[in-house]
């Protein structure tokens, strides 16, 4: 197993490698087959690894994936690619309004972890909030609680604040689906949409920039879903019924339906892949 780390230094990478190093020492057979490497963007080095690979697991943007896939590999090499994806949250306004204070606090903390912790940069972080059974009082109750919690936990970087304001101005100029925009402070920007359009996934927020829409029915969402849609985080929603509706609609996207707070919980099933199965070779004897 050869893992190429990002060429930039991040303290999280060092911490994770240290932890993995401690654990992997208990399993010598795995340790001697595993290496973490770092090198500048260099197709010659990557090509040398690709030529010997049985599996290429590629994380990155669409352009990065296309670049790696273009490098020669053995005829039986399996590619598992994790490309650009888009995620959203589906909240029930009446459920938010009826929630006890402790339930609301838990919801807000979970939502914060799904969004602000990664500045919405993760592919599974919701960019747009869809409200079913929309209730203005429920919506305001939610956002007031999010604002109060984020003020205590989130440090808004100057560059992020500038980017958010620039994005808001660009939306006001070019987004024909924009209905209204709300910002009490620089912490949270809310852009309400008057309709869902086929280019929904082009609208992405970062650092507390959220799109919102009052959903008439699930079919309205399904009409704009593409293969780019990954995770739907839910609150107050019948997840089993929603999952059945997604399957029945034979959508090309929406691979994960999880509670708010579980957006980042990666497992052996990701992006619609069963990773253990796809990374295994099966030997069958009759």
Where are each of the predicted segments found?
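Short, conserved catalytic or adaptor-binding loops enriched in Gly and charged residues
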Residues: 26-30, 71-72, 202-203, 248-251
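Short catalytic-loop micro-motif centered on adjacent basic/acidic residues
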Residues: 3-4, 55-58, 232-233
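Conserved NAD(P)+-binding/catalytic subdomain of aldehyde/semialdehyde dehydrogenases
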Residues: 27-128, 133, 261, 269-286
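Short phosphate-engaging motifs
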Residues: 12, 63-64, 87, 138, ...
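Conserved small-residue-rich beta-alpha loop and adjacent elements
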Residues: 1-24
